[in-house]
Amino acid sequence: MPALLSNIDPDGLLEFSVVYTDRALNHMSKRFQGVMQDISAILKDVYAAHSVALVPGSGTFGMEAVARQFAHGQKVMVIRNGWFSFRWTQIFDMGAIPKQSIVLKARQQSTDTKSAWAPCSIEEVEAQIAAEKPAVVFAPHVETSAGMILSDAYLTRVSAAVHKVGGLLVLDCIASGAMWVDMKSTGVDILISAPQKGWSGSPCCAMVMLSERARQAIDTTQSSSFACDLKKWLQIMEAYEAGTHMYHTTMPTDALAQLRDVMQETQAYGFAKVKQEQLELGQQVRTLLESRGFKSVAAEGFQAPGVVVSYTQDAEIHNSKKFLALGLQTAAGVPLQCDEPKDFMTFRIGLFGLEKLHNPGRSVQHLAHALDEMGYLPIAAKEPAMA
């Protein structure tokens, strides 16, 4: 017999399972099996991944799932470029996960308290990996507290150093936007993403992509979590890929169906095209902010196109109140946890989503109008002054 509500699942069954109601997509349905297969195929395509797992929750759930699967009792290393790579340390400490954690912090480029920041030099990272021989290295592709990105060349050298000592490289791509990372060419072993930024979806899960090397390694590991058991969620996805289904905990089926739809929309538009849009929009917004006197927190060569973080001395820009008053939801500045000076004060602008990327002129104009209204007009100075 057909489902009562055709808008949920036109080809669905009458709902009498013990998991869902008629108003939700059943995880055992043919429609949801197709959703999972489509998501997996697209993720494997764009990231050149070998395997995919979806962990219900948010990107941080994926971070913790990876840590509890691969880092228990191990010596690990974290490339910390700000507050959201400090999150690895918070996860480790809360769960008493690794036996030792070595942190390589981003550094300011001069003694000027408003100078730009860059990640630990790749030469130092390589030397530390060779000396310490960590089992796992954790790095942020884009650090949202600093607007800092690690280049493919940087990542490739990190992965080569990690592999030389037999370790794995984990890359947090939750805030990467449309700056897709090719796991095969960069050597990334485990890549973590989420729906709500680069994929223009609603938050509902973490996407964890594994290389062939990591897929082999996970079979020798045991998670210290039940709900965030990454190996179990990998098995769930592999069951869907095989044309069947499996249950661990209840999945956000309707949100995943919506995610699949927007992933297919992005795929049809073109991953390379949307990446170029991300690059161009980021450059335009950075140029705008510098023209109004706002210095970038991230140094040249490390400036992310999807997250722009700038210095300010205005407390109501820092806490986003001035933007809110003009109808814009920006993000307040946060600490870096990288030994920054006491007067460190920033604000953050996110440039995520197809609506912004497909309409760069409109996106920039919204920000320019807000800055005009605040009184931050274009300046003639060659070098940006402090705002």
Regions found by a protein language model. Name each.
Residues Q196-S291, E355:
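Active-site C-terminal subdomain of aminotransferase-like
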Residues P2, P341-A387:
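PLP-dependent enzyme catalytic core of the Aspartate aminotransferase-like
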Residues E290-R362:
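Conserved C-terminal alpha-helix-loop-beta "cap" of PLP-dependent enzymes
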Residues T111-G177, I190:
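Active-site phosphate-binding strand-loop segment of PLP-dependent enzymes
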